[in-house]
């Protein structure tokens, strides 16, 4: 649905070149809720501007719904832009217009009939739960209600793609959760492909099925949300995951436990999915290695509607200890693991 092929984007200011994007490649599939996460300045919003053709790539290709728009003119982009909706962090509503007129604006600009406008706007306001607010003005609404108006406005043209640029950053946690639920409903009800730009890993965890992690203009990690949460490969991905899920004991706890440890030991970090939780993992490990297994840490969380568990296990070592058998067990059971000592 959206594809970036070795895309780079540079800006030139006062004899200085700023590389906003460097050789970015990834694909957003049809019906995805695809998250792009990174800190400020990572290049996330530049990607959105390329999809909207507000900026042109310096190098590479940008493919939208099968069209290579890299070198499209504004005129050539008109029909494609009709299939792209957009919501922003600060809503971008007209304060002098009612909720109804704000939602209707794209249809008014497209010169649709009054009958069609009334029908379509009424449908969208009902969908976002604001039918009773149609005659109110933005200043009379809460932040969450304003974002619902913005979502209705983005949907009123029946787009194929919805771009969300930090759409929940200005909202409190409870309101954020309700907006994410609404966006998931948008995806499921209308089959709209959603590209989420965010710096909040909780947004990725709660709504996205796939994610790209960006740092300094580059995509440093991509994968399913489960893959990235279960085994983040890069330091920045590990840092983002740790903001919403504690996946291992604190360094201070490890130091205290190590100080009390007698003899050599080996530690494992494992990631257990919901479908694996009925297996007697600890009991199996005790039988395999013939010794006690210490659980130094355990935490559970929910990712994409599935419960997952992170555990840190410790085995005392001696000459009879067979780490190969433990590794083989994890592989046979498809349990993701990492030796950490």
UniProtKB/Swiss-Prot annotation:
InterPro entries: AAA+_ATPase, ABC_transporter-like_ATP-bd, ABC_transporter-like_CS, ACT-like_dom_sf, MetN_ABC, MetN_ABC_transporter-like, NIL_domain, P-loop_NTPase. Residues 2-241 form the ABC transporter domain. It is found in: Cell membrane. It catalyses: L-methionine(out) + ATP + H2O = L-methionine(in) + ADP + phosphate + H(+); D-methionine(out) + ATP + H2O = D-methionine(in) + ADP + phosphate + H(+). It is a peripheral membrane protein. GO terms for cellular component: plasma membrane. The keyword Metal-binding does not apply. It comes from the Bacteria. Its main location: membrane. The keyword Membrane applies. GO terms for molecular function: ABC-type D-methionine transporter activity; ATP binding; ATP hydrolysis activity. Gene3D superfamilies: 3.30.70.260, P-loop containing nucleotide triphosphate hydrolases (3.40.50.300). Its EC number is 7.4.2.11. ATP binds at residues 38-45. Keywords: Amino-acid transport, ATP-binding, Cell membrane, Membrane, Nucleotide-binding, Translocase, Transport. The complex is composed of two ATP-binding proteins (MetN), two transmembrane proteins (MetI) and a solute-binding protein (MetQ). Part of the ABC transporter complex MetNIQ involved in methionine import. Responsible for energy coupling to the transport system. Belongs to the ABC transporter superfamily. Methionine importer (TC 3.A.1.24) family. This is Methionine import ATP-binding protein MetN 1. The gene is metN1.
